[in-house]
């Protein structure tokens, strides 16, 4: 994990600054116990090699454990371990420095930066880091005061570093809770970090994960979790995740979205929205596949209540297409009068004055054949709606078709007329008022 501290501290040469500080103190007051102590310390001022610093500090500590400059020595240990890349020792040294000055900027920043790199960070380490983040967030101005920051940091540099430090401490507070598996608290802290700085791909991912981890008890959080995953996967600006991580996360998002929603419908819109905004809009939701199915069933039930003929047909078709459909037809439907059904005209035979109609109830190609007791008048264009009742005579499963014998007098919706009827209708005079 890359931890960007940039302008949090201007401390790359803090060892030199501390040396100058000690030298200044040496001129002002006799803090050295004797010249031998100063001679023991002096090699630190003559090199930039942290290995020499460490060897010198160890000798100094061994020979003068109660030095009046022990607090300065602890700060030098901190910088030395940091320069050597010894994260655990730097972390512990920072804790020692904070005992001297709880607002020491360099020590606090070392702790919140190093906690990510400890392998692993134990409960005590997390407690220490939590106290550091609390101090930073509660007293940012205080820890950037001249007496607490590196001597070479200017007021302008301090002012520029404060917002970045606030964001860093805030996301670290969330990471600590996330590492403890206190996902509800982590969610709150990560959301605060996003509000402070929306351009944080890693934090967006952590926030999504913290919300998803609560899925068993709070399944309603899953859609928003998917949003933050989409944000982390699609955002490619400053502080975004590496391209390889975004690619892997995109693959995960595609799978998770499909599993949750039941299809990829709306996924591209989700990604586009997340790319442009770090947080979801008010009222944001993604319907789950279960919710969609529930709504479909409810809508179907409501439709069946208002369209009983469609409900009847659905039940009949389900019974006929079942493995025992043939038996069902022979014992329950054949030669029985089936109540009124409704379908759209597909074909008539013959086209004019037909005695046979093909209707579509569900299948647009037709799933009902009506054999009439006589010819209907004229002809009718396909697509018109016809209601009928009739006696079931036969059926086939593939293609599905049920054949009824129907009394044409009980047919509703046929609009065809014979030629003589049309002529009589057209010959009628219209009397206009005088």
Where are each of the predicted segments found?
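N-terminal leader/linker segments that initiate helical-solenoid repeat arrays
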Residues: 22-76
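Structural register within alpha-helical repeat arrays
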Residues: 40-43, 76-77, 111, 166, ...
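Short coil/turn linking the two alpha-helices of tandem helical-hairpin repeats
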Residues: 44-45, 81-85, 112-123, 175, ...
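Short solvent-exposed coil/turn linkers within tandem alpha-helical repeat scaffolds
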Residues: 63-71, 99-106, 141-165, 193-200, ...
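TPR/TPR-like (Sel1-like) alpha-helical repeat modules
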Residues: 116, 127-141, 212, 218-240
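OB-fold and OB-like single-stranded nucleic-acid-recognition modules
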Residues: 267-434
């Amino acid at each position: 994990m890359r931890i960007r501290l940039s302008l949090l501290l201007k401390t790359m040469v803090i060892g030199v600054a501390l040396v100058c500080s000690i030298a200044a103190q040496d001129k002002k007051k006799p803090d050295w116990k004797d010249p031998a102590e100063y001679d023991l310390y002096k090699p630190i001022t003559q090199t930039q090699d942290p290995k020499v610093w460490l060897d010198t500090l160890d000798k100094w500590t061994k020979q003068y454990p109660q030095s009046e400059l022990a607090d300065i020595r602890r700060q030098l240990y901190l910088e030395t371990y940091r320069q050597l890349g010894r994260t655990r020792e730097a972390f512990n040294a920072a804790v020692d420095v904070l005992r001297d000055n709880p607002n020491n900027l360099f020590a606090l920043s070392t702790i919140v930066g190093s906690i990510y790199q400890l392998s692993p960070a134990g409960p005590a380490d997390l407690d220490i880091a939590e106290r550091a983040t609390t101090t930073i967030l509660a007293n940012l101005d205080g820890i950037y005061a001249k007496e607490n920051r590196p001597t070479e940091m200017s007021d302008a540099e301090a002012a520029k570093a404060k917002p970045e430090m606030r964001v860093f401490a805030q996301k670290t507070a969330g990471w600590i809770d996330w590492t403890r598996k206190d996902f509800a608290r982590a969610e709150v802290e990560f959301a605060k970090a996003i509000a402070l700085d929306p351009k944080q791909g890693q934090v967006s991912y952590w926030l999504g994960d913290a919300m998803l981890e609560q899925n068993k008890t709070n399944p309603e959080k899953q859609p928003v979790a998917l949003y933050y995953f989409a944000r982390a996967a699609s955002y490619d600006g400053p502080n975004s995740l590496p391209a390889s991580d975004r690619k892997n996360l995109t693959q995960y998002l595609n799978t998770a979205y499909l599993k949750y929603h039941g299809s990829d419908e709306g996924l591209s819109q989700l990604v586009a929205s997340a790319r442009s905004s770090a947080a979801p809009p008010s009222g944001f939701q993604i319907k789950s596949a279960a919710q969609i199915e529930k709504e479909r069933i409810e809508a179907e039930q409501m439709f069946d209540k208002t369209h009983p003929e469609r409900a009847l047909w659905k039940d009949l078709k389900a019974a006929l297409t079942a493995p025992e459909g043939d038996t069902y037809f022979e014992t329950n439907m054949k030669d029985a009068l089936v109540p009124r059904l409704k379908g759209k005209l597909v074909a008539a035979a013959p086209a004019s004055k037909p005695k046979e109609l093909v209707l579509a109830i569900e299948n647009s190609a037709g799933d009902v054949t009506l054999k009439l007791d006589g010819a209907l008048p004229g002809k009718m264009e396909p697509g018109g709606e016809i209601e009928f009742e009739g006696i079931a005579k036969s059926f086939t499963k593939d293609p599905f078709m049920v054949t009824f014998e129907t009394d044409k007098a009980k047919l509703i919706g046929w609009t065809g007329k014979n030629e003589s009827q049309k002529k009589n209708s057209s010959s009628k005079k219209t009397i206009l008022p005088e």
